[in-house]
Amino acid sequence: MKIIVQRVKNARVTNDTIDNQINKGYCLLVGVGQNSTEEDVKVIARKIAHARLFEDENDKLNLNIQQVEGEILSVSQFTIYADVKKGNRPGFSNSKAPEQAKDLYQKFNKELEGYGLIVKTGEFGTHMNVEINNDGPVTLIYESQDGKII
């Protein structure tokens, strides 16, 4: 699994059927790879839930999302696993098949909720408009494989 974590002042995802937004927190762009497993879901959700990406009174990144009462906007994004080595058009064979990816994506969001986090989502497998108001910017890439952070 690969997840781009962006610390945001606010973020919003919309399409014809949804309109979800958050204030302070993380916007997560979630990629589910061919070899992603439920163990990857658990380890990466735990890592993100406990990540200290917010400044304390000394401007050090010492506070996690719970401590600042932040929220999460989780958006599925299979293009994170694009292969751009050959030609000019990306290939997506490294992404998990849609039904399996959707299942792991939903489990990932539930796992985050299990840490007491408020998680709002986009709509899996559809075209969406995503508005991200980065804070910092603070942007990190988390990746798990074989149940371990890599």
Swiss-Prot record:
Catalytic reaction annotation: glycyl-tRNA(Ala) + H2O = tRNA(Ala) + glycine + H(+); a D-aminoacyl-tRNA + H2O = a tRNA + a D-alpha-amino acid + H(+)
A Pfam family recorded for this sequence: Tyr_Deacylase
Role summary: An aminoacyl-tRNA editing enzyme that deacylates mischarged D-aminoacyl-tRNAs. Also deacylates mischarged glycyl-tRNA(Ala), protecting cells against glycine mischarging by AlaRS. Acts via tRNA-based rather than protein-based catalysis; rejects L-amino acids rather than detecting D-amino acids in the active site. By recycling D-aminoacyl-tRNA to D-amino acids and free tRNA molecules, this enzyme counteracts the toxicity associated with the formation of D-aminoacyl-tRNA entities in vivo and helps enforce protein L-homochirality.
Chief place of localization: cytoplasm
Short sequence motif Gly-cisPro motif, important for rejection of L-amino acids: positions: 136-137
GO BP terms, alphabetized: D-amino acid catabolic process
EC supergroup of this enzyme: hydrolase
GO cellular component: cytoplasm
UniProt-annotated location(s): Cytoplasm
Protein name: D-aminoacyl-tRNA deacylase
Keywords on record: Cytoplasm, Hydrolase, RNA-binding, tRNA-binding
Family affiliation: Belongs to the DTD family.
GO molecular function, one term: Ser(Gly)-tRNA(Ala) hydrolase activity
Enzyme Commission identifier(s): 3.1.1.96
Quaternary assembly: Homodimer.
Free-text comment on this protein's domains from its UniProt entry: A Gly-cisPro motif from one monomer fits into the active site of the other monomer to allow specific chiral rejection of L-amino acids.
Domain of life of the native organism: Bacteria
